[in-house]
Amino acid sequence: MARVRTLADLRTEDEADEHTPLYNAETGSRDSDSTSSGGAAPRSMPIRFLELLFPHFSLKSVVLAISIVDWIFYIVTVCLDTELPLIPAANILVHFGANYPPLIKQGQVWRLLLPVFLHANFFHVFFNVFFQLRMGFTIERRYGLLKFTGLYFASAIYGNLLSATAFFCNSLKVGASTAGFGLIGIQICEMALTWHRMRHRDRMLTNMVSFVLLMVLLMFTLNGGSIDQMGHLGGLLCGFSIGMLYNKELNDKPVWYPWASAAAIGILLALPAACFPILYAVDRHCHRDLSYI
């Protein structure tokens, strides 16, 4: 399989010694531990392959645990009931917590989070898990477990909230791509913050655009063309905004950072402040599909 390159790969090439402010001291110490000339045992071939496919692969990673839970939820929902082979029935997805706005309006706010563990078919879960692992290990390593967990689930909540507000009637959404777009958002933020000192800007931009286009193409082909655009937008905005706040200690920040940081806080506050009143107070005049219940 051809290796899909991410922002982290190119930044590592640009700054091979990893003396970039985006790598914190804890990350640096792990790097030196893993590459020291001491008595560290050589890695096995399977681990090396996984690290090639998923940079900074680690068994002790929250993104790996989340991905395992994704597969468990998918297997359970398929075993309970299917509409077609390997496609969970819609009523099963609703009972497990799918993003179904009429029920969110009734107070079932957990439906803003649980859809991140549910998927519509085999290719849907495979694709989302692959790309969140492809990006997630590096991001988790850079920011740490707690910050990564906050980024991941906040992006999922913001994405599902914007989706539920925009597509209220006859809308049933599931998938980890809301959180996945949050990971893309923080990588775009990193690229923007370090753009002025990158040596290979054209290559960085080309690979990022190619990566996003490939992801969108696969979504349309493997998920039947049913794309939650607003969910992706919400996750992307959340990830980008959180990235601005996570990198406030970055050295040599662009001159526009104070305004961008203020805008990021504004987005994180304004989106729920606008969406919740619309979601709960505005009568959409649509009927709940009782076949889902």
Swiss-Prot record:
It is found in: Cytoplasmic vesicle, Secretory vesicle, Microneme membrane. It comes from the Eukaryota. It catalyses: Cleaves type-1 transmembrane domains using a catalytic dyad composed of serine and histidine that are contributed by different transmembrane domains. It is a multi-pass membrane protein. GO terms for biological process: proteolysis. Its main location: membrane. It is an enzyme of class 3 (hydrolase). GO terms for cellular component: cytoplasmic vesicle; microneme membrane. InterPro entries: Peptidase_S54_rhomboid-like, Peptidase_S54_rhomboid_dom, Rhomboid-like_sf. One of its GO terms (molecular function) is serine-type endopeptidase activity. Keywords: Cytoplasmic vesicle, Hydrolase, Membrane, Protease, Serine protease, Transmembrane, Transmembrane helix. The active site is at residues 177, 232. The chain crosses the membrane at residues 62-82, 112-132, 148-168, 174-194, 217-237, 262-282. Belongs to the peptidase S54 family. Serine protease involved in intramembrane proteolysis and the subsequent release of polypeptides from their membrane anchors. Has no detectable activity towards MIC2. This is Rhomboid-like protease 1. It comes from Toxoplasma gondii. The lineage of its organism: Eukaryota, Sar, Alveolata, Apicomplexa, Conoidasida.
